[in-house]
């Protein structure tokens, strides 16, 4: 069974999508089967993985959550970027989903029901087809869609910008997750805080690190790897690339790879596993993806 992990924060602009995409790609490069799920109406994850899917997709996560009925035969909204790296595209119509969920039976469990759906080809539940499933959540905290993500998840990763605004909203987020845990009786917990846009030269980065290092205060550990400030994070999105395809030797690519290695329990990186090596694998896969898409 996979680990289902939501990336969630009360505020926007804290690299949830960047972290979702690049952790997913890093784990794929490490040989894991990965599914990325986009529940944010901005669809930034979908646009990063494949911009054309909004024009060509027969089904998105919105279509499934909006009107799927148990027992109904319908193609799953799962698409393939690379062999072993799949994604469920989002939709701008997700801006309506919270109001629509209010009227639905079992409204907090729609996404969980989706992951429990049996794939007709493999005969396995979706959640059992992958090693890791990452859910890119919308900012805004306590919404029915985010509640769906928490109910469907085993863990939450909280990407946290190394700036003063990252401290705002944390008490609300912690209260929200605890309320979902207790009231809906789901076992979700915070896997850790992922410090992003880290700059060791800035005093505020050090202050934020010190705050999140107080596990008694923030109720979860801080990941031991910090994702450094890197302009390549913004640039790569424009080319529908992860960092590993766009700039495999940049600092952020190395940091996200180290976070992925931490997740799988790798204690030390083999000497042969270098930016050059993972860049070759990622670039070859990307060129094949573009060739296939262009027909």
Residue ranges: model-predicted function:
Residues 1-295:
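P-loop NTP-binding core
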């Amino acid at each position: 069974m996979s680990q289902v992990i939501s990336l969630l924060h009360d505020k926007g602009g804290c690299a949830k999508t960047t972290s979702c995409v690049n952790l997913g790609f890093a784990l794929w490069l490490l040989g894991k089967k990965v599914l990325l799920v986009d529940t944010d109406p901005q669809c930034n994850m979908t646009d990063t993985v494949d911009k054309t899917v909004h024009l060509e997709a027969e089904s998105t996560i919105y279509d499934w959550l909006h009107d799927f009925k148990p027992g109904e035969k319908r193609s799953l909204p799962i698409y393939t970027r690379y062999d072993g790296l799949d994604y469920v595209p989002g939709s701008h119509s997700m801006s309506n989903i919270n109001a629509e969920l209010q009227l639905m039976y079992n409204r907090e469990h729609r996404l969980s029901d989706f992951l429990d759906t049996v794939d007709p080809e493999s005969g396995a539940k979706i959640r059992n087809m992958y090693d890791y499933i990452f859910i890119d959540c919308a900012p805004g905290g306590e919404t029915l869609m985010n509640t769906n993500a928490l109910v469907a998840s085993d863990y939450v990763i909280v990407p946290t910008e190394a700036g003063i605004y990252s401290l705002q909203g944390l008490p609300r987020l912690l209260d929200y997750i605890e309320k979902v845990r207790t009231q809906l009786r789901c076992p979700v917990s915070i896997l850790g805080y992922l410090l992003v846009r880290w700059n060791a030269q800035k005093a505020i980065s050090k202050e934020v690190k010190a705050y999140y290092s107080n596990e008694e205060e923030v109720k979860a550990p801080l990941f031991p790897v910090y994702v450094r400030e890197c302009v390549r994070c913004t640039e790569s999105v424009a080319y529908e690339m992860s960092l590993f395809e766009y700039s495999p030797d940049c600092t952020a690519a190395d940091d996200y790879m180290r976070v992925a290695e931490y997740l799988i329990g790798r204690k030390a990186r083999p000497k042969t596993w270098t930016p050059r090596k993972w860049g070759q694998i990622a670039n070859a896969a990307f060129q094949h993806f573009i060739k296939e898409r262009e027909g």
